[in-house]
Amino acid sequence: MIKWILIGMAALIGLTAAGVVLLAAIANHKGANYWRFAEPQGAIETRYTGLGEYEVSLAEFDAPGTVWEKYEIWYPSDLEQSDKPYPVVVIANGTGMKASKLRAIYEHLASWGFIVAGNEDEHARTGASSAATLDFILSLNDDPQSVFYGRVDTENIGITGHSQGGVGAVNAVTQQKNGNLYKAICAQSTTSSAVAYALNQLDGELGGGWNCDTTALSIPAFMVAGTGTADAGNVEENRLELAGGETQGICPLWWLRECFDAMPDTVPKVIGRLSGRDHGAIPISADGYMTAWFLYWLQGDEAAGRAFFGADAEIRDNENWQDVTINFP
């Protein structure tokens, strides 16, 4: 049983590597202007795919004695002269995709008025590095010598992550001691329980710690994936016994639905898949609606919220998206 899962995973690793190479190629070619080449549909997705109004600055801090090496914090440059607090988004890294490789995504989110905090952890699935990153930015909020002194809106903190980082984001909220400080989450292409089962059997840095449990989520949650082969696979159910030619995707539709159903119905929750997009492209392709999600929950932007809620929620009829399910109690 494990053999077939791992054979499928070997194929998926090749596909995922191709997705990562594609993402790197896009980043190298388009750099910080990736959003100019996006293809959003609908007024809300289009608006929040573009840059916000803020110029962005970066502060870096060493994290000696840790596997994540340093903390990187992107923030609106106006913060340095402002007397108001800014909401925070922590980003949990996907496998090998540390913050320094995805600067454009951090900068984009910060341009919309967020303090965006990350690190160099390449194995973020437990949520430990995200928890440490949150603790660090909160310590700066209490430090009179820091530019962030009194500038962190501690009542409005969100977290996002892609792939392994999706698992890390969920675990940061549900398993870490400071998880109760988060107000909203966006988990992208979160590694499924079937793939997690196989990965948990491995030795070394990739072995163990891959499970996450959305039953414990009590904050608004937006979970996304793609319809491409690496994310979707070709098995439509949670099944470990696979026949030849069958592969479990990293984040298939059955997993999104399982995560959605596991979350309490008292919690606002949305799932959806990006049509024609695969695993490596999700962080860029979902960026507009991820930004809108956090603007609504952390900044009270009602226009952004109309992407998800109400009779005319834009994401329902957006040609870029399919398999959308919304619960807004």
Question: Positions of the model-derived regions?
Answer:
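Gly/Ser-rich "nucleophile elbow"/oxyanion-hole loop immediately N-terminal to the catalytic nucleophile
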Residues: 80-86, 128-168, 175-179
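Short beta-strand element of the alpha/beta-hydrolase
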Residues: 83-94, 107
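N-terminal Sec-pathway targeting helices
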Residues: 1-18
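Glycine-rich His-Gly loop
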Residues: 91-95, 163, 226
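Short conserved active-site loop signatures built around small residues
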Residues: 18-85
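The feature captures the conserved acid-bearing segment of alpha/beta-hydrolase catalytic domains
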Residues: 182-282
